[in-house]
């Protein structure tokens, strides 16, 4: 039996395809809370067409994220919570075509660097 191995390039393309086509929103923030990456699912959930309109927003300035969740993130905790997301509040931070209220289930994984300092925050969100 001939076993085919994948090249690093093929693996990267596969990972990118999965990431872009997941039916959930994925957002990656740097250690200071600034958005550095978002997938198509995340853009759709936020009502934004152009990724550039969202890059650079800060999760700690988002009025829709509860203060307690922000505190826990700063402390380096992995968290999961449901949020009542008000798009009218969000419009002060990014241009969304949505308005009103949605509910999202959000899971956040804290990524640590080699010194065990917060390097990134990975948000996975789904509409509930």
Regions found by a protein language model. Give the residues of each.
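Amphipathic alpha-helical coiled-coil "transmission" helices that mediate dimerization
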Residues: 1-6, 10
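PAS/PAC or PAS-like capping segment
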Residues: 5, 127-128
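Sensory modules in modular signal-transduction proteins
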Residues: 9-33
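Conserved hydrophobic beta-strand signature of PAS-family and PAS-like sensory domains
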Residues: 35-37
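N-terminal capping loop/helix in small sensory signaling domains highlighted by a polar->aromatic N-x2-3-F motif
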Residues: 39-42
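Glycine-centered C-terminal helix-capping/turn motifs at helix ends
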Residues: 46-49, 55-56, 64
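Terminal output helix/cap of sensory domains in signal transduction proteins
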Residues: 61-100
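PAS-family sensory domains
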Residues: 106-109, 116-127
């Amino acid at each position: 039996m001939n076993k085919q191995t994948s090249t690093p390039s093929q693996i990267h393309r596969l990972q990118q395809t999965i990431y872009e086509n997941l039916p959930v929103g994925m957002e990656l923030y740097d250690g200071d809370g600034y958005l550095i990456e978002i997938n198509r699912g995340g853009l759709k959930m936020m009502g934004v067409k152009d990724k550039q309109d969202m890059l650079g927003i800060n999760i700690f300035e988002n009025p829709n994220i509860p203060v307690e969740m922000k505190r826990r993130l700063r402390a380096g905790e992995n968290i999961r919570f449901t949020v009542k997301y008000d798009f009218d509040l969000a419009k002060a931070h990014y241009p969304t075509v949505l308005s009103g209220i949605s509910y999202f289930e959000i899971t956040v994984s804290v990524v640590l660097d080699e010194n065990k300092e917060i390097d990134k925050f990975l948000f996975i969100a789904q509409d509930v």
